[in-house]
């Protein structure tokens, strides 16, 4: 029986290096490393969005990556991509982040009743952004009701 000894070193994560790697060899980064790179950019910036879209391409079965990519798509008002990413989620539909993203999608599509259901579920779970989105939904509903009154009055 032969006994072999192998020594190896694990390289520490370097954010600046990871920012370069994601552009050329994203397959060399873990999903967590991609998340750290994304969060090093301003939320909603093109770089932030690009990293989340790269993550969902590299890890298409990871539902958190899909939810993050959907949120990034929603931030740039890309409803088609957001819906596609959210449709990739099967198991984690109870996550407040999923419900919030679906609520925002429904809000932007003008489906206020569905939006309210999703956003209330997310807010009930304690997601602060969902509460803010519910406030935005209330404003949209009020505006829509005012517009309808004006249109009906002018007939």
Task: For the regions a language model picked out, list residue spans one by one.
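N-terminal targeting segments with Sec-dependent signals, encompassing both cleavable signal peptides
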Residues: 1-155
